[in-house]
């Protein structure tokens, strides 16, 4: 699932702690499992570039990953929730858009790897065992 969020609260888009919390809590809320703690970086503005800074973060999941890129000066955020497991994309969209105060959201949900998922049940059990669950 990809989300492009417009008209977001600019302070929230630059809030390292809030975005860490989003990446830390969302996986459990949508039935996924973190493989590692989230990593979140404040990105400073770059001279001679359209990039006026923001925050980039991601969390690696047993099921894949979630990433976020924010552009506070523009009130814009781009988020990917990539998973080899189905999840409630409507819930994820509403949770994220409310948290960031988005006025408009473009959502794309694409089913990928339909042949690969035949191997998934064994893989998730193995990954859970490795992660100590």
PLM-predicted stretches and their roles:
Residues 1-133:
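Polybasic/polar functional segments that serve as interface/processing modules
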